[in-house]
Amino acid sequence: MNHYLHELIHTQKNILFLQGPVGPFFKKVAEWLKKSGCNVYKINLNGGDEYFYSKNSVSFCKSVEKFPQFLQDYIYQHSIDAIIVFGDCRIYHKIAKSIADSNPNLSFWVFEEGYLRPHYITFEKDGVNGFSLLPKNHDFYENIGITSIDKSNGKSHYYSMIRYSVIYYIFMLLKKYKYSNYIHHRKTSLSFYASHWVLALIRRLKSKLIEPRLIKNVINNEHKPFYIFPLQCNQDFQIQEHSPYHSMKSYIFRVICSFSLFADEKSYLLIKHHPMD
Protein backbone atom coordinates (compact mmCIF):
# COMPACT_ATOMS: atom_id res chain seq x y z
CA MET A 1 0.00 0.00 0.00
CA ASN A 2 2.81 2.45 0.88
CA HIS A 3 4.33 1.88 -2.56
CA TYR A 4 1.06 2.80 -4.28
CA LEU A 5 0.48 5.86 -2.07
CA HIS A 6 3.98 7.08 -2.87
CA GLU A 7 3.33 6.63 -6.59
CA LEU A 8 -0.05 8.38 -6.33
CA ILE A 9 1.12 11.56 -4.62
CA HIS A 10 4.29 11.87 -6.71
CA THR A 11 2.83 11.21 -10.16
CA GLN A 12 -0.78 12.42 -10.00
CA LYS A 13 -1.86 16.03 -9.58
CA ASN A 14 -5.65 16.22 -10.10
CA ILE A 15 -7.46 13.44 -8.26
CA LEU A 16 -11.15 12.58 -8.47
CA PHE A 17 -12.97 10.62 -5.76
CA LEU A 18 -16.13 8.66 -6.50
CA GLN A 19 -17.87 6.54 -3.83
CA GLY A 20 -16.01 5.66 -0.66
CA PRO A 21 -16.83 3.52 2.36
CA VAL A 22 -19.65 4.78 4.58
CA GLY A 23 -18.24 7.41 6.91
CA PRO A 24 -15.67 10.22 6.64
CA PHE A 25 -12.73 8.11 5.39
CA PHE A 26 -12.57 9.57 1.87
CA LYS A 27 -12.85 13.10 3.24
CA LYS A 28 -9.86 12.47 5.50
CA VAL A 29 -7.84 10.92 2.67
CA ALA A 30 -8.69 13.92 0.48
CA GLU A 31 -7.45 16.32 3.17
CA TRP A 32 -4.19 14.38 3.41
CA LEU A 33 -3.74 14.49 -0.37
CA LYS A 34 -4.34 18.25 -0.39
CA LYS A 35 -1.58 18.69 2.18
CA SER A 36 0.65 16.65 -0.12
CA GLY A 37 0.06 19.15 -2.93
CA CYS A 38 -2.70 17.43 -4.89
CA ASN A 39 -5.90 18.98 -6.21
CA VAL A 40 -8.87 16.91 -5.09
CA TYR A 41 -12.37 16.63 -6.59
CA LYS A 42 -15.44 14.60 -5.61
CA ILE A 43 -18.60 13.37 -7.34
CA ASN A 44 -21.49 12.38 -5.07
CA LEU A 45 -24.04 9.83 -6.25
CA ASN A 46 -26.53 9.79 -3.36
CA GLY A 47 -27.48 11.56 -0.15
CA GLY A 48 -25.16 9.42 1.97
CA ASP A 49 -22.19 10.39 -0.18
CA GLU A 50 -23.19 14.04 0.06
CA TYR A 51 -23.57 13.98 3.86
CA PHE A 52 -20.04 12.74 4.47
CA TYR A 53 -18.41 14.82 1.70
CA SER A 54 -20.46 17.93 1.00
CA LYS A 55 -17.80 20.62 0.44
CA ASN A 56 -15.92 20.99 -2.85
CA SER A 57 -18.02 18.33 -4.53
CA VAL A 58 -20.59 17.99 -7.30
CA SER A 59 -23.70 15.83 -7.48
CA PHE A 60 -24.61 13.49 -10.30
CA CYS A 61 -28.40 13.09 -10.33
CA LYS A 62 -29.14 11.82 -13.82
CA SER A 63 -29.61 8.26 -15.03
CA VAL A 64 -26.64 5.89 -15.05
CA GLU A 65 -26.79 5.81 -18.87
CA LYS A 66 -25.67 9.44 -18.86
CA PHE A 67 -22.86 8.91 -16.36
CA PRO A 68 -20.14 7.93 -18.90
CA GLN A 69 -20.47 11.21 -20.81
CA PHE A 70 -20.83 13.22 -17.60
CA LEU A 71 -17.67 11.64 -16.19
CA GLN A 72 -15.66 12.09 -19.37
CA ASP A 73 -16.65 15.76 -19.55
CA TYR A 74 -15.74 16.26 -15.89
CA ILE A 75 -12.36 14.57 -16.38
CA TYR A 76 -11.62 16.83 -19.36
CA GLN A 77 -12.78 20.05 -17.66
CA HIS A 78 -10.65 19.47 -14.55
CA SER A 79 -7.68 17.72 -16.17
CA ILE A 80 -8.21 14.69 -13.94
CA ASP A 81 -5.30 12.25 -14.07
CA ALA A 82 -6.37 9.83 -11.31
CA ILE A 83 -9.66 8.34 -10.09
CA ILE A 84 -10.01 6.82 -6.61
CA VAL A 85 -12.90 4.54 -5.63
CA PHE A 86 -13.88 2.10 -2.91
CA GLY A 87 -14.58 -1.24 -4.55
CA ASP A 88 -14.28 -1.70 -8.30
CA CYS A 89 -17.47 -3.63 -9.15
CA ARG A 90 -20.14 -1.00 -8.47
CA ILE A 91 -21.77 0.03 -11.73
CA TYR A 92 -20.48 3.63 -11.57
CA HIS A 93 -16.97 2.44 -10.73
CA LYS A 94 -17.03 -0.06 -13.60
CA ILE A 95 -17.79 2.84 -15.93
CA ALA A 96 -14.92 4.85 -14.44
CA LYS A 97 -12.55 1.89 -14.84
CA SER A 98 -13.58 1.48 -18.48
CA ILE A 99 -12.85 5.16 -19.16
CA ALA A 100 -9.49 4.92 -17.37
CA ASP A 101 -8.54 1.81 -19.36
CA SER A 102 -9.06 3.71 -22.62
CA ASN A 103 -7.09 6.78 -21.47
CA PRO A 104 -3.30 6.36 -21.03
CA ASN A 105 -3.16 9.61 -19.05
CA LEU A 106 -5.75 8.51 -16.48
CA SER A 107 -4.97 6.08 -13.65
CA PHE A 108 -7.47 4.10 -11.58
CA TRP A 109 -6.97 3.40 -7.86
CA VAL A 110 -9.07 1.24 -5.56
CA PHE A 111 -9.46 1.10 -1.79
CA GLU A 112 -10.89 -2.05 -0.25
CA GLU A 113 -11.27 -3.49 3.22
CA GLY A 114 -8.03 -5.26 4.04
CA TYR A 115 -7.22 -8.65 2.61
CA LEU A 116 -5.74 -9.24 6.07
CA ARG A 117 -7.94 -8.10 8.93
CA PRO A 118 -8.33 -6.47 11.35
CA HIS A 119 -6.27 -3.24 11.26
CA TYR A 120 -5.31 -3.32 7.57
CA ILE A 121 -6.52 -1.43 4.48
CA THR A 122 -6.08 -2.54 0.88
CA PHE A 123 -5.13 0.05 -1.75
CA GLU A 124 -4.19 -1.05 -5.26
CA LYS A 125 -3.79 0.31 -8.74
CA ASP A 126 -6.12 -0.89 -11.53
CA GLY A 127 -8.26 -3.21 -9.35
CA VAL A 128 -8.71 -5.31 -6.24
CA ASN A 129 -9.86 -8.84 -5.37
CA GLY A 130 -10.36 -10.78 -8.61
CA PHE A 131 -8.97 -7.82 -10.60
CA SER A 132 -5.92 -7.38 -8.37
CA LEU A 133 -2.44 -7.39 -9.89
CA LEU A 134 -1.19 -9.44 -6.95
CA PRO A 135 0.28 -12.82 -7.97
CA LYS A 136 -2.30 -15.60 -7.94
CA ASN A 137 0.29 -18.37 -7.84
CA HIS A 138 0.25 -20.29 -4.55
CA ASP A 139 4.04 -20.80 -4.68
CA PHE A 140 4.67 -17.04 -4.60
CA TYR A 141 3.18 -16.72 -1.12
CA GLU A 142 4.79 -19.94 0.11
CA ASN A 143 8.22 -18.51 -0.75
CA ILE A 144 7.81 -15.02 0.74
CA GLY A 145 9.41 -16.20 3.96
CA ILE A 146 7.26 -14.22 6.41
CA THR A 147 6.93 -16.18 9.64
CA SER A 148 5.07 -13.63 11.76
CA ILE A 149 3.34 -10.26 11.58
CA ASP A 150 3.58 -7.59 14.25
CA LYS A 151 0.37 -7.36 16.22
CA SER A 152 -1.43 -4.05 15.80
CA ASN A 153 -2.59 -2.03 18.78
CA GLY A 154 -5.52 -0.62 16.82
CA LYS A 155 -8.90 -0.48 18.50
CA SER A 156 -12.11 -1.98 17.19
CA HIS A 157 -14.39 0.47 15.36
CA TYR A 158 -17.28 -1.95 14.95
CA TYR A 159 -19.84 0.31 16.62
CA SER A 160 -18.58 3.38 14.75
CA MET A 161 -19.12 1.43 11.54
CA ILE A 162 -22.71 0.70 12.58
CA ARG A 163 -23.30 4.38 13.39
CA TYR A 164 -21.85 5.55 10.07
CA SER A 165 -23.91 2.97 8.18
CA VAL A 166 -27.16 4.08 9.80
CA ILE A 167 -26.39 7.75 9.08
CA TYR A 168 -25.43 6.97 5.49
CA TYR A 169 -28.62 5.08 4.68
CA ILE A 170 -30.85 7.59 6.45
CA PHE A 171 -29.48 10.42 4.30
CA MET A 172 -29.63 8.23 1.21
CA LEU A 173 -33.38 7.89 1.86
CA LEU A 174 -33.89 11.54 2.85
CA LYS A 175 -32.33 12.76 -0.40
CA LYS A 176 -33.86 10.12 -2.62
CA TYR A 177 -35.91 12.89 -4.27
CA LYS A 178 -32.66 14.52 -5.44
CA TYR A 179 -30.87 11.33 -6.49
CA SER A 180 -33.95 9.50 -7.78
CA ASN A 181 -31.99 7.85 -10.60
CA TYR A 182 -29.27 6.43 -8.37
CA ILE A 183 -28.63 2.68 -8.56
CA HIS A 184 -27.19 1.19 -5.39
CA HIS A 185 -25.03 -1.92 -5.38
CA ARG A 186 -26.90 -3.52 -2.47
CA LYS A 187 -30.36 -3.58 -0.92
CA THR A 188 -31.09 -0.11 0.41
CA SER A 189 -34.04 -0.75 2.71
CA LEU A 190 -33.20 0.76 6.11
CA SER A 191 -35.44 -1.81 7.79
CA PHE A 192 -33.49 -4.58 6.03
CA TYR A 193 -30.18 -3.30 7.36
CA ALA A 194 -31.55 -2.49 10.82
CA SER A 195 -32.98 -5.97 11.31
CA HIS A 196 -29.80 -7.67 10.11
CA TRP A 197 -27.54 -5.46 12.24
CA VAL A 198 -29.64 -6.32 15.30
CA LEU A 199 -29.31 -10.03 14.51
CA ALA A 200 -25.57 -9.60 13.94
CA LEU A 201 -25.22 -7.78 17.27
CA ILE A 202 -27.06 -10.56 19.11
CA ARG A 203 -24.87 -13.15 17.41
CA ARG A 204 -21.76 -11.13 18.29
CA LEU A 205 -22.70 -10.92 21.98
CA LYS A 206 -23.51 -14.62 22.04
CA SER A 207 -20.17 -15.43 20.43
CA LYS A 208 -18.29 -13.51 23.11
CA LEU A 209 -19.68 -15.95 25.65
CA ILE A 210 -19.10 -19.13 23.67
CA GLU A 211 -16.13 -18.58 21.35
CA PRO A 212 -13.28 -17.91 23.85
CA ARG A 213 -13.39 -21.51 25.05
CA LEU A 214 -13.55 -22.88 21.52
CA ILE A 215 -10.70 -20.64 20.34
CA LYS A 216 -8.61 -21.69 23.33
CA ASN A 217 -9.17 -25.33 22.40
CA VAL A 218 -8.01 -24.65 18.85
CA ILE A 219 -4.91 -22.73 19.99
CA ASN A 220 -4.03 -25.55 22.37
CA ASN A 221 -4.16 -27.98 19.45
CA GLU A 222 -7.11 -29.91 20.83
CA HIS A 223 -8.59 -29.91 17.32
CA LYS A 224 -5.53 -30.72 15.26
CA PRO A 225 -5.12 -30.82 12.35
CA PHE A 226 -7.73 -28.28 11.25
CA TYR A 227 -8.50 -26.30 8.12
CA ILE A 228 -9.84 -22.74 8.26
CA PHE A 229 -12.75 -21.94 5.95
CA PRO A 230 -13.40 -18.15 6.11
CA LEU A 231 -16.83 -17.06 4.88
CA GLN A 232 -17.62 -14.00 2.79
CA CYS A 233 -20.64 -11.69 2.94
CA ASN A 234 -23.44 -13.12 0.81
CA GLN A 235 -23.80 -9.93 -1.26
CA ASP A 236 -20.07 -9.30 -1.61
CA PHE A 237 -18.69 -8.93 -5.12
CA GLN A 238 -16.17 -11.66 -4.34
CA ILE A 239 -19.15 -14.00 -4.53
CA GLN A 240 -21.31 -12.17 -7.07
CA GLU A 241 -18.56 -11.29 -9.56
CA HIS A 242 -15.48 -13.39 -8.85
CA SER A 243 -16.79 -16.85 -8.01
CA PRO A 244 -18.86 -19.57 -9.70
CA TYR A 245 -21.29 -19.58 -6.77
CA HIS A 246 -24.57 -17.70 -6.50
CA SER A 247 -24.59 -17.55 -2.70
CA MET A 248 -22.58 -18.47 0.38
CA LYS A 249 -25.01 -21.33 0.98
CA SER A 250 -23.94 -23.12 -2.20
CA TYR A 251 -20.30 -22.35 -1.43
CA ILE A 252 -20.54 -23.83 2.09
CA PHE A 253 -22.35 -26.91 0.77
CA ARG A 254 -19.61 -27.52 -1.82
CA VAL A 255 -16.77 -27.18 0.72
CA ILE A 256 -18.40 -29.40 3.35
CA CYS A 257 -19.13 -32.11 0.79
CA SER A 258 -15.57 -31.98 -0.50
CA PHE A 259 -14.13 -32.04 3.02
CA SER A 260 -16.25 -35.02 4.03
CA LEU A 261 -15.10 -36.96 0.97
CA PHE A 262 -11.40 -36.15 0.80
CA ALA A 263 -10.12 -34.87 4.17
CA ASP A 264 -8.50 -37.15 6.70
CA GLU A 265 -11.10 -38.45 9.15
CA LYS A 266 -9.13 -36.96 12.05
CA SER A 267 -9.15 -33.48 10.51
CA TYR A 268 -11.46 -30.64 11.54
CA LEU A 269 -13.07 -27.96 9.39
CA LEU A 270 -13.10 -24.60 11.17
CA ILE A 271 -15.72 -22.33 9.57
CA LYS A 272 -15.15 -18.62 10.29
CA HIS A 273 -18.24 -16.43 10.00
CA HIS A 274 -17.71 -13.05 8.32
CA PRO A 275 -17.81 -10.28 10.97
CA MET A 276 -19.92 -8.00 8.76
CA ASP A 277 -22.54 -10.55 7.73
Task: Enumerate the language-model features and the residues they cover.
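Conserved catalytic-core segment of nucleotide-activated headgroup transferases in glycan assembly
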Residues: 36, 182-276
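Conserved acidic residues
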Residues: 13, 79-81, 225
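Hydrophobic anchor at the start of a short beta-strand
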Residues: 40-41, 108, 267
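Active-site-proximal region of nucleotide-activated glycan assembly enzymes
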Residues: 107-203
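Active-site and donor-binding regions of nucleotide-sugar-utilizing enzymes
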Residues: 18-28, 45-141, 277
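N-terminal subdomain of nucleotide-sugar transferases
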Residues: 1-46
